[in-house]
Amino acid sequence: GIRDDIDAYIQKTYPTEEQRKAVSQYARSLQASLLVDLENKITVKAATNTTSRAISCIFKKVPSGNSPNGGSVVEEILGVTTNTKQRLLQYIALDKALDGTVISSPSGDVCDESLFTMPDQRL
C-alpha cells in the first residue's frame, strides 16, 4: 500500500482525482519495489516494469509530469518515499540489482484505474 504520510501528501498536493490516482499508482509501485527480493532478477524486473507503467501514467494524467509545486512528480514522490537512510539504501540496492538489464517503454493502457491493493508492508 501507500504509507500514510505519502497518501496525505498526495491528497494535499494533487487537485484532481485522476491525478491522485496516477500519483498513487506510482507511490504504490515504488513502495512495493523497495520490498522485492533483490536476488530474484524476475521479481526485480517485474517491479521495475510496474513502476515504469506508473511513471508513464503520470505523464499521461499530470500536465507535463510536473506537480503543482513546480517540480517533477516522479522526483517528489521518490524523495518522500526514500526519506530515511534505510529506504534510500534499499532504493540504491534496487537500482544496482538492475545493472545490465534492459527495460522497455510500456505500451497499451499504462494507468491502472482500479483501486487495486498490494500487501500493506512498509520499511
What are these regions (language model features)?
Residues D4-L123:
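Calcium-binding acidic motifs and repeat modules
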